[in-house]
Amino acid sequence: MLDISIQELIKQWQKYLILQKNYSNNTVIAYNNDLKHFLEFMNYYNSELVTLNHIKTADIRLIRSWLAKRKCENFTASSIARGLSTVKNFYKFLEKTLLLNNHIIFSIKSPKKAKLLPKGLSVDDVLISLEHIEEYGNVKWVELRNKALIVLIYAAGLRISEALSITKLHLQNLEFIKIIGKGSKERIIPWLPLTKNLITKYLEILPYKLDENEPIFRGRQGKKLQPSVFNRELIKLKRIYGLPEYLTAHSFRHSFASHLLEYGADLRSIQELLGHKSLSTTQKYTQTSIKHLEAVYNTAYPIKK
């Protein structure tokens, strides 16, 4: 249980994340779940209703006990690190709005995350997906929507949240699309004729009237399409055609980067297209490319035979 004043603070924090920090709804939901888990543990730890004073006086033992509990509950290192980052974010908000300081929180280092390489699809997997995704919509406009979404993500390297935020206003420029990504970072991506043609065909048969600033990708009931709904369409696809288990909407973004690198694009350009703040994030794809080259070498290099 939480004190009513704490509940109100959490609502203000969520508004701050959306309006000031430009976080996506999915990110805010994840952050809210992390904070809820932390405050529930604080409630258990102190054996009483959490108040602002409990938050202000939280010590290093409490934080470390909470992190240990998450580890015991089989949270991944990445999830544990994100949880701590969420708590720090909340405390920064309190420091800014209430002048509430708790520097102990910021002294705790995040657990080391396993460095997982991004998993992209092969070109063949992408082509199979494009060829067969239209078989699972049952309604023509849904089938076209699914295909247009895959092409958009793969051809432009968009995050699923970015793709699902595309409006008719984005279609007005014939040469490029302007994306506002994480942290309000703006990037410009060229339109491919195939992408725009598919989206245009989809909009021509979409049974719902949309304003120019409304997201164009809609669910069957006319509401904004949710990532989970689209990923369910992909689950059907990969089960029937034996596609990789890691095939998701986001895997097409990874494939965009990996395939550009394999075909000679430079890292800086890929960084700009993906909207990565740091080049080190983009450099993960060089490891993926090296793995690909090693596989080709091991199976095809004539001297090895």
From Swiss-Prot:
Residues annotated as domain Core-binding (CB): 4-95
Main location: cytoplasm
Top-level division of the source organism's lineage: Bacteria
Pfam family, one: Phage_integrase
Active site: R159, K182, H250, R253, H276, Y285 (o-(3'-phospho-dna)-tyrosine intermediate)
GO cellular component: cytoplasm
SUPFAM superfamilies per the UniProt record, alphabetical: DNA breaking-rejoining enzymes
Record keywords: Cell cycle, Cell division, Chromosome partition, Cytoplasm, DNA integration, DNA recombination, DNA-binding
Molecular-function annotations in GO: DNA binding; tyrosine-based site-specific recombinase activity
PROSITE patterns found in the cross-reference section: CB (PS51900), TYR_RECOMBINASE (PS51898)
Chain ranges of the Tyr recombinase domain: 116-298
Assembly notes: Forms a cyclic heterotetrameric complex composed of two molecules of XerC and two molecules of XerD.
Job description of the protein: Site-specific tyrosine recombinase, which acts by catalyzing the cutting and rejoining of the recombining DNA molecules. The XerC-XerD complex is essential to convert dimers of the bacterial chromosome into monomers to permit their segregation at cell division. It also contributes to the segregational stability of plasmids.
Protein family per UniProt: Belongs to the 'phage' integrase family. XerC subfamily.
Protein name: Tyrosine recombinase XerC
Organism of this sequence: Rickettsia prowazekii (strain Madrid E)
